[in-house]
C-alpha cells in the first residue's frame, strides 16, 4: 500500500527488507534469502514487495549459494540480495570478512554488499587527514590503487576492488574544487578568507572517482589532499615527489558522462609543476581510452595560482567518459609539487543570479565585538552553495558556506578599531558552473559601538598535566 500511495503522490519509495523476520513464524535470522522469508521478495505480477534483501551477518558459502538459487527461482537478480557486513563491531576495514564465501570461480561477487555502519571510519583517527587515510583504505584498499591487488598480508579488500565505478559527473556541467567539506582555512580564488578551522559538510564537492589510479614509467608522485593551500574552499589536490629524468605518468581522476557542445569550455585552476609538462586529457570512449584528437590540453605552469581556459567545441557531439592528468618531464626534478585547485567542464558561462531579500532574522550579542545571528535570503536554482561574509574595516572575511538559504552564524565579529554601530554582511551564490554571483548585502545592527562594552578576560592557562 505504501508503495502505491507514494507513486500516487509522485514520490516513489524503495524498500530493503532486513533478514530478521520470517513470513509466518516471527523473528528469525536465516542469514540469507531462504524458505522462511522469500515471500518478501516474491513478485506479485509486475510488482515486488521489497526491492532489496539485506542478509544478516552470519552468512556462509552454503547460505550464499542458497540465496543465489532462491533469487533465481523467484525471477529476481541475485544482486538484489545484499550480504551484510557488520562494520561497526569489527572496526571498519579491520572487520574479518569471509570473502571466499562471496566470490565465484572468477573472483566476482555473487551477491551485493550491504555495509552496516561504514561511518565507523570516523572513529579511527583524530584529524581530517586521518579520516581520509582511513577512508582510502576502506574504499580503495591498502594497496592505494583501485586497480591493484590486495596485499597478501592484509585481509581487507577495498570496496572499489569489488564493484564498478559510478559517477555523479553527468550532463553538460561539471565543476569541482575537490572540497572535502572541512578545512584549516577557507580560500577564495587562491587567497585566505577565513584563517581558522571549519566544517561545512553541505559545501562538499565531487571528489576524485579513483584515489588513486596512477601509472608511471618511474616512481609515482604522491597524491593527496592539501589543506594548507587551495584555490576555493578548504583544500586542493597535491601531487608531490621526486621526478626521475624522462618520466611519464598518468593520474586518472574522474569517471564522467559529460555531453560536449560547441559552447563547452574547460577551466582549470592550478599552481606549481615547473620542470614538467602537465596536461588535462579526456577519454571519449566508454572504456576510458585516451588519446583522441583535441582531447589533450597543456596547462601553463606558474609558481602562483593561475587559471587556464580552453575551448572544447572541437569535441562537440561527443561524450567525455574520463578525465586524467598527465605529467611529462625530461630532466630530473627534486621536490616536485603540482596543485590542482579547480576543474570545470561546462557550456554554461553565465554567472548565477545574486541572492535577494537578505535579512538578519535573529541576532544575539555577546559583547560589542562578538555576536551570533541567523540570516535568511532568497536563493536560486543555479546555485550550488552560498558564501556568507562580514566586512571588518576594508576587508571582507568569510563567515561560513552553506547550501541552505537560512544560515546560522555562530560568530559575527568586528575588530576593536571598528567604527559605528552597524556592520555590513554579504551573501554570494557559487553556481553549479563554478562562477560567483554579485553579492546581496545587508547591515548587522550592533546597537552600540565597540567602546560600549569591555571584553571578558581570557581564561587562565591550565598548567595541571
What are these regions (language model features)?
Residues 287-319:
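Extracellular carbohydrate recognition and processing domains
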Residues 408-446:
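Beta-strand-rich modules
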Residues 367-383, 465:
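Conserved aromatic anchor
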Residues 2-37, 50-61:
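Aromatic-lined carbohydrate-recognition surfaces of secreted/lumenal glycan-active proteins
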Residues 221-250:
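Short carbohydrate-recognition loop motifs
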Residues 60, 78-225:
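Substrate-binding cleft of secreted/luminal carbohydrate-active enzymes
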Residues 268, 307-343:
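Extracellular beta-strand ligand-recognition surfaces/modules
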Residues 237, 249-278, 308-311, 343:
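Extra-cytoplasmic beta-strand recognition segments
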Amino acid at each position: 500500500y505504501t508503495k502505491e500511495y507514494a507513486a500516487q503522490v509522485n514520490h516513489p519509495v524503495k524498500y530493503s527488507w532486513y533478514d530478521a523476520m520470517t513470513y509466518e513464524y516471527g523473528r528469525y535470522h536465516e542469514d540469507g534469502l531462504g524458505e522462511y522469508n522469500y515471500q518478501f521478495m516474491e513478485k506479485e505480477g509486475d510488482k515486488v514487495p521489497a526491492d532489496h534483501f539485506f542478509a544478516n551477518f552470519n552468512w556462509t558459502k552454503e547460505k550464499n549459494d542458497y540465496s543465489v538459487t532462491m533469487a533465481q527461482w523467484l525471477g529476481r537478480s541475485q544482486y538484489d540480495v545484499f550480504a551484510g557486513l557488520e562494520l561497526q563491531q569489527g572496526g571498519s576495514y579491520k572487520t574479518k570478512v569471509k570473502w571466499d564465501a562471496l566470490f565465484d570461480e572468477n573472483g566476482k561477487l555473487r551477491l551485493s554488499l550491504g555495509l552496516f555502519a561504514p561511518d565507523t571510519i570516523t572513529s579511527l583517527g583524530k584529524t581530517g587527514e586521518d579520516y581520509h587515510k582511513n577512508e582510502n583504505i576502506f574504499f580503495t584498499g591498502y594497496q592505494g590503487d583501485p586497480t591493484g591487488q590486495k596485499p597478501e598480508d592484509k585481509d581487507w579488500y577495498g570496496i572499489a576492488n569489488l564493484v564498478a565505478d559510478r559517477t555523479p559527473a553527468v550532463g553538460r556541467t561539471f565543476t569541482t574544487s575537490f572540497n572535502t567539506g572541512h578545512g584549516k582555512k577557507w580560500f577564495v580564488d587562491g587567497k585566505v578568507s577565513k584563517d581558522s578551522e571549519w566544517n561545512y559538510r553541505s559545501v562538499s564537492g565531487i571528489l576524485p572517482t579513483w584515489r588513486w589510479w596512477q601509472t608511471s614509467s618511474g616512481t609515482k608522485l604522491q597524491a593527496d589532499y592539501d589543506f594548507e593551500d587551495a584555490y576555493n574552499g578548504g583544500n586542493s589536490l597535491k601531487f608531490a615527489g621526486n621526478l626521475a629524468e624522462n618520466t611519464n605518468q598518468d593520474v586518472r581522476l574522474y569517471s564522467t558522462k559529460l555531453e560536449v557542445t560547441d559552447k563547452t569550455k574547460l577551466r582549470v585552476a592550478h599552481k606549481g609543476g615547473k620542470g614538467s609538462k602537465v596536461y588535462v586529457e579526456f577519454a571519449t570512449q566508454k572504456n576510458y581510452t585516451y588519446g583522441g584528437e583535441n582531447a589533450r590540453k597543456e596547462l601553463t605552469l606558474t609558481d602562483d595560482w593561475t587559471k587556464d581556459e580552453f575551448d572544447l567545441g572541437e569535441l562537440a557531439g561527443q561524450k567525455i567518459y574520463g578525465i586524467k592528468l598527465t605529467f611529462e618531464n625530461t630532466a630530473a626534478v627534486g621536490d616536485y609539487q603540482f596543485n590542482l585547485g579547480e576543474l570545470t567542464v561546462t557550456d554554461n558561462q553565465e554567472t548565477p543570479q545574486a541572492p535577494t531579500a537578505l535579512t538578519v532574522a535573529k541576532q544575539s550579542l555577546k559583547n560589542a565585538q562578538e555576536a551570533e545571528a541567523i540570516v535568511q535570503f532568497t536563493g536560486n536554482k543555479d546555485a550550488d552553495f552560498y558564501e556568507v561574509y562580514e566586512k571588518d574595516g576594508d576587508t571582507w572575511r568569510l563567515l561560513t558556506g552553506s547550501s541552505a538559504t537560512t544560515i546560522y552564524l555562530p560568530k559575527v565579529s568586528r575588530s576593536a578599531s571598528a567604527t559605528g554601530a552597524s556592520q555590513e554582511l554579504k551573501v554570494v551564490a557559487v553556481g553549479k558552473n563554478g562562477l560567483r554571483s554579485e553579492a546581496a548585502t545587508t547591515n548587522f545592527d550592533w546597537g552600540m559601538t565597540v567602546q560600549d562594552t569591555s571584553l571578558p578576560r581570557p581564561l587562565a592557562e591550565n598548567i595541571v598535566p
